[in-house]
Amino acid sequence: GVKTSLQGQTNLKNLYAIGETSCTGLHGANRMASNSLLECVVFAKSSAEDIKLNFDYESADIDEWDNSKVITAGENIIIAHNWDATRRLMWDYVGVVRSNDRLNMAKENLKLIYEEVESFYRNFELTSDFIELRNLVLVAKIIIESALARKESRGLHYNIDFPDLNKSAVPSIISK
């Protein structure tokens, strides 16, 4: 999730994250799917109060997007294929029960998808579907790197190569 303050504020001015998106530390590694009601309700109220008091409504000066040098790709099949390949890769290799061998295979396979997506990102017209795909691939990359960095099993994240919980508290892995 996205690291936030207790008001849901991220490190980007005026950008808040609440619920499934946020990383607040309320539930730790054992928060199961659809169990973020506490974060949704509490942080929504806290964020709303913070926005009401502190939100800067001035918009930033942003240069117009220059797409004169980009090519219209018209390659929806590439988006669909890479989306499906990333989804299957994460399901098959980076599920709840993991091994370092599968994580490393996932990392290598995702590298090919990432390189193709980045090539399109630099040279072709962007669509919302393509931007979602790029974000999906980047998040998958961060998840794999974080799973490889953790040398223990904690909560619902189980690595058969490191089946035991490290008794000393290990801070959350934060990736930039």
Question: Which residues make up each language-model segment?
Answer:
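Glycine- and aromatic-enriched mobile tails/lids
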Residues: V2-A17, T21-K176
